[in-house]
Amino acid sequence: MFNYGNANEAQKEAISATDGLVLITAGPGTGKTFTLVKRAVYLIQECGIKPEQIMMATFTEKAAKELITRITNELAERNVSVNVNEMYIGTFHSLCLRIIKENLEFTRLKRNYRLLDTFDQKYLVFRNFHKFKNIEGIDELLSKGGSWKRSDEICTYINHLSEEMVDIEALQSDDNPGIRTLGRVLSVYQEMLEEGNLIDFSTIQTECYKLLMQNKQILEELQDTLQYLMIDEYQDTNYIQEQIVFLLGAKHHNICVVGDDDQGLYRFRGATIRNILEFPH
């Protein structure tokens, strides 16, 4: 019989509810991480699921490392010998980057690509600001500050559009002139990334989604492999993250999301409470 430890009845139910779509909502300090750890252990020990068949997405590297450590220790205490490092555990960005790296030849990126951090991205736009300043309507879009400040504003627009999976062609054909300007800004920026063999924080997920959508075999292999998906802090997910989750889980439909709708009444890097409130029942 599975040892649930100090789990209460609600947690036991969440741990053992392995099949189908599962939504777990709880406030801070109510043992959400504990429940996720036990759930992963339950899948491995009781259901015979291999580590590589489980994906767990978090929002910080610290949280991902904590999950790996706690799952490893829990399994060791139960004398279950598996390699937890084979699990897909990490932030959405690190998981998407892993998928890209494993299938690099099917992306626009070459082997020596460079990943831009926040400063690198801003500096790239600043260095190429002349490509943006002549775009029609750009002055109405940006403040009256200097090029560095305006470059930062451009990056904010770009990141938001990328994370919400906004279609460039739809932007450029919109009736609103300001939206058409945004479309041109995004188009110029993406050309810069392609020319420089670059990828940034906000486009990692976009590139991963494109890879999956454009390569049926890769998608099907991942769908076959990833039988159980668990998403922590689901209230923080944005549109593209939600799309990737349901794309990867489309075959087995075993998706568990953990979130707190009380903490989700804000947007951070595009995150929206809509995702948790609209989760399929």
Model-identified regions with their sequence ranges:
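P-loop NTPase Walker
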Residues: 1-109, 220, 274, 278
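Conserved helicase NTPase motor core
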Residues: 4-16, 20-23, 55, 63-64, ...
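Non-catalytic alpha-helical coupling and interface elements of nucleotide-dependent molecular machines
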Residues: 45, 72, 76, 100-105, ...
